[in-house]
């Protein structure tokens, strides 16, 4: 049996408590995972400052080169994993088996992670807006235009409390090591594969192991990471977002409520954009915060909903190793059933119609003994009032909402990715000014088509570093 | 009364004698296991302990159901039974004739319905569990908490818990038993107890409303008080702390460049389902170091205090608890049949029995589960290991708030 240790500043640690991670379909134990405890994390974090010290022995450029090497190792090599080894195919197989994500999607996530690593230098250049890297290393320095600037690291390590079921989020922490900041990862119980494989790839590419901690474990471990790391990211639901709202130490990532807005100037050509809409809703099994959960327009909404339903409604689950599999399974007992029941309840509201039902052979909810599927669902709302008009679920689900353009920005609420199909300069200006839209696409860009040179939910540079005043000579006389 | 003769605090003897109950009725309180001579033949010890338990059970039932000594609650309850406890309980296993004890019976008053007539007029305490919202469960106590902790005292090694040294009690007081019990333990061993309070109901409220920062600030406030006391030259060598508070205290002392050991503490006992094998190891190897003794305990207001099997490297930090028989009994029972013991090494739910003159509980389903363990030379009756929240409640139970 694969035995996976806790990693404490690069050193494997065998715990007295081990938890099996199981195949979601069969319940077969695939690995035994050593469990950390909160106190142990708090103890380790007393040495966190060392991580930055070690990483600053390398330049950011050198670390970016190591990222390129790590990308290749992560994508192609057979790497050690606990008491065994793992090749890329085995990685996809086991990730799929524990998260319920089809193997082809696991492979796609691998390629995405590797891409970000391969292009780390460009990513950092973009996120720092061309700041010379040694300013981040030294804390201050002269820009090419002769201005003294200072960026002070706010932490020696970044803590990450990672989700269980979403292998797509790991790109967020990849720039951290080349920014000379250590990594403290609390992997999700079903998706520890990416953190462990990435750790090994980084280490074999030359990054000292002593700058990594990996703490699989229970809730107290997440709490300890959040408490002791000066900067931390956490993934969770609306409640998690609310809990950490306004805490400068924490970046909380939760539901995205990403949407596609069709402007009045382009909505009559909606048929041209059906592929864009369907892919935004459906790719990665609709499991991402960047997956669209709403399509908003002032007219043609019934026709748009029908076209999307016709496209997505018939899609059914396939075996996880089928290259054409496109639906992920729900592996948490009762979750799919509860979501399905909630949808049924919300559908009872006047003005709400499920359009996909007529294109689906059977029920939305497909229960199995140990897991479930929810089949794609498209709902039409005659206004933005019903609760289901602005809802997000972990499967391909979208509401097509009829709403006048002049009310749209106000009514869409918080939106992580807004893809807006318009050429209207006035509305475009309003969209640019809308602070409830985080990532704005004006043009034919899928909501899930991220450019890695752009910041995601806040710039990680601003999160980890603070621009401040620094002078080593008096200012000019004035 | 061997427990008194072991005390190094003579004034306590006087107090205990004054508070002794019912001079005309003798309840035999068999010596706690550690006082028994070590019998090489474990099965003989087991048989002997079983016989003592049977006798103690009969005596306890007689007390609680006799019209002259029983409590209003049990005398009333007996009227609803289809059997007569006074004539039909002849051994411990006969307790299965009683329906399971419902802890809801402990909510609300009048509390006096629990006082056995035979103890009427004695000064009584009320200890509570739960109570964050709604009416807490209450238990009436006269001296059980003293007796429980005196018995527990006999299991503590003197070299780590030196007699005559002072104690720190870092945990909940208020309506809980802990403060008075630990304070009595300190006094019984000839020391004085310094107490730092923590209100778990407030912590649960903070956590339920998502105020993690508020809970942390409150924990810091508690720990700061403990650090101050330890630095005040009170010669504190022994401590009770909950695992979370002990951890926070140790880390705080490290931040100040010192440690639990350097503060003078040589012996600690802590308890609860958070005292896991991994935490035990972490404590011994990293948090406390090899020169500070720590021992796990398991218990609650209803049962008293179960002791941990003495540390043995061969156990690989497995924690096995033994109830203070015959005053209390722990069974590990099938999840689908609470009258059926699981096999040794198998997992089941914790069932508690309390058999003292003050309280009779014929089978209470605790909110924990664990594995049934074989009797030990020191404790020749069943033990339980791996105690953790009962899996059906685990997701809804807030554990380890203090």
Label every model-predicted segment:
Chain B
Residues 20-22:
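Intrinsic-disorder-associated, low-complexity terminal segments enriched in Asp/Asn/His/Tyr and depleted
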Residues 177-182, 280:
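Short, highly selective alpha-helical patches that border small-molecule cofactor pockets
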């Amino acid at each position: 049996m694969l035995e996976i240790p806790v990693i404490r500043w690069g050193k494997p640690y065998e715990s007295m408590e081990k938890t099996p991670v199981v195949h979601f379909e069969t319940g077969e134990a695939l690995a035994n995972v050593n469990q950390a405890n909160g106190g142990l994390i708090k103890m380790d974090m007393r040495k966190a400052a060392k991580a930055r010290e070690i990483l600053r022995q390398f330049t950011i450029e050198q670390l970016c080169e190591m990222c390129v090497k790590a990308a290749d190792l992560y994508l192609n090599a057979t790497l050690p994993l606990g008491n065994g080894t793992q090749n890329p195919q085995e990685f996809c197989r086991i990730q799929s088996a524990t998260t319920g994500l089809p193997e082809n999607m696991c492979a796609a996530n691998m390629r995405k992670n590797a891409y970000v690593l391969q292009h780390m230098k460009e990513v950092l250049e973009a996120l720092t807006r061309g700041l010379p890297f040694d300013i981040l290393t030294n804390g201050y320095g002269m820009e090419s235009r002769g201005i003294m600037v200072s960026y002070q690291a706010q932490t020696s390590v970044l803590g990450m409390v990672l989700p269980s079921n979403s292998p797509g989020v790991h790109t967020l922490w990849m720039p951290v090591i080349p920014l000379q900041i250590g990594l403290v990862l609390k992997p999700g119980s079903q998706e520890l594969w990416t953190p462990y494989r990435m750790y090994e790839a980084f280490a074999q590419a030359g990054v000292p192991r002593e700058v990594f901690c990996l703490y699989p474990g229970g809730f107290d471990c997440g709490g300890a990471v959040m408490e002791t790391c000066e900067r931390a990211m956490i993934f969770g639901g609306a409640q998690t977002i609310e809990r950490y709202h306004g805490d400068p130490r924490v970046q909380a990532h939760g539901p995205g409520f990403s949407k596609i807005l069709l402007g009045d100037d382009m909505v009559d050509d909606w048929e041209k954009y059906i592929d864009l809409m369907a892919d935004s809703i459906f790719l990665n099994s609709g499991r991402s915060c960047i997956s669209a959960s709403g399509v908003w327009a002032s007219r043609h909404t019934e026709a748009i909903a029908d076209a999307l339903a016709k496209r997505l409604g018939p899609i059914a689950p396939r075996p996880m190793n089928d290259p054409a599999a496109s639906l992920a399974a729900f592996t948490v007992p009762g979750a799919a059933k509860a979501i399905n029941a909630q949808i049924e309840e919300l559908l009872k509201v006047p003005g709400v119609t499920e359009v996909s039902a007529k294109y689906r052979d059977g029920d939305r909810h497909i229960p199995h003994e140990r897991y479930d599927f929810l089949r794609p669902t498209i709902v039409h709302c005659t206004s933005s009032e019903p609760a289901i008009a602005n809802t997000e679920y972990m499967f391909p689900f979208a509401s097509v909402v009829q709403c006048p353009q002049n009310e749209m920005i106000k009514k869409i609420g918080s939106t992580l990715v807004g893809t807006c199909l318009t050429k209207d300069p006035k509305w475009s200006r309003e969209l640019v000014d809308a602070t409830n839209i985080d990532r704005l696409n004006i043009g034919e860009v899928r909501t899930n088509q991220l450019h890695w040179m752009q910041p995601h939910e806040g710039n990680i540079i601003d999160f980890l570093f603070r621009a401040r005043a620094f002078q080593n000579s008096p200012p000019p006389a004035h | 009364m061997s427990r008194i003769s072991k005390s190094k605090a003579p004034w306590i003897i006087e107090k205990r004698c004054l508070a002794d109950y019912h001079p005309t009725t003798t309840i035999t309180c068999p010596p706690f296991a550690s006082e028994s001579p070590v019998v090489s033949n474990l099965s003989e010890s087991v048989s002997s302990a079983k016989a003592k338990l049977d006798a103690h059970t009969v005596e306890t039932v007689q007390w609680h159901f006799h019209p002259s000594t029983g409590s209003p609650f049990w005398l009333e309850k007996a009227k609803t039974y289809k059997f007569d406890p006074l004539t039909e309980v002849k051994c411990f296993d006969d307790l299965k004739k009683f329906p399971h004890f419902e802890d809801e019976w402990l909510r609300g008053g009048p509390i006096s319905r629990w006082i056995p007539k035979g103890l009427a007029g004695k000064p009584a305490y009320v200890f509570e569990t739960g109570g964050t919202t709604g009416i807490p469960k209450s238990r009436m106590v006269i001296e059980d908490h003293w007796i429980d902790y005196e018995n527990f005292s006999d299991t503590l090694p003197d070299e780590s818990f030196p007699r005559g040294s002072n104690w720190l009690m870092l945990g909940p007081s208020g309506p809980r038993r802990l403060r008075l019990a630990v304070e009595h333990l300190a006094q019984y061993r000839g020391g004085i107890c310094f107490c730092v309070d923590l209100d778990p109901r407030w912590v649960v409220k903070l956590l339920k409303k998502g105020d993690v920062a508020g809970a942390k600030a409150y924990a810091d406030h508690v720990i700061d008080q403990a650090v101050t006391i330890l630095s005040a030259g009170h010669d504190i060598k022994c401590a009770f702390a909950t695992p979370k508070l002990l951890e926070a205290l140790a880390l705080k002392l490290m931040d100040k460049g010192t440690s639990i050991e350097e503060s003078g503490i040589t012996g600690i006992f802590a308890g609860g389902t958070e005292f896991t094998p991994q935490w035990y190891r972490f404590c011994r190897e990293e948090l406390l170091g090899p020169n500070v003794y720590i021992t796990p305990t398991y218990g609650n207001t209803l049962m008293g205090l179960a002791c941990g099997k003495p540390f043995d490297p061969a156990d690989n930090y497995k924690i096995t608890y033994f109830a203070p028989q015959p005053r209390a009994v722990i069974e590990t029972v099938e999840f689908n049949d609470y009258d059926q013991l699981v096999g040794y090494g198998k997992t089941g739910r914790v069932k508690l029995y309390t058999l003292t003159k003050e309280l009779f509980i014929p089978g209470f389903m605790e909110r924990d589960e664990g594995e049934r363990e074989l009797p030990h030379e020191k404790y020749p009756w069943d033990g339980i290991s791996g105690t953790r929240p009962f899996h059906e409640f685990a997701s809804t139970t807030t554990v380890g708030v203090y």
